[in-house]
């Protein structure tokens, strides 16, 4: 079976509309005071986008749930590593993406509704939750663009 057929028929499409919808739902959660749910959605935005970018390359995601490992797989598949021949400002932006992934993963593990933490739960302000959602949305759109431009 040709890869295009498999992709078309078996992979749910992650596109800008999907990302926008999930982001809007996360912002609604913030407006309603459900900050931990918004953090979980910000992680989902990244995880879904990373998995989709990996799958359209015909690969299996390495470890669903660990967005750090998924992002590493995306970087490897799309050659998104810092490069001495690339503009240094672009390299700085690419290195900043690492921090976004790591920070959102940590917020999810310590400040969302995805795990029971009891008194160890980290409390965040609504503006921190907005930062997480907006950061994950921007990064997801970037990864989506990279994956679409490499077809």
Residue ranges and their predicted role:
Residues 46-57, 78-82, 115, 147:
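Alpha-helix capping/termination and helix-coil
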Residues 93-151:
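Charge-enriched, short contiguous segments at helix-coil
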Residues 20-28, 84-89, 117:
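Short, charged/polar, low-complexity loop and linker segments
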Residues 26-33, 56, 115-119, 147:
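Secondary-structure edge/capping motif, primarily at the C-terminal ends of alpha-helices
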Residues 1-32, 37:
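Internal, Lys/Arg-enriched amphipathic helical interaction segments that engage polyanionic partners
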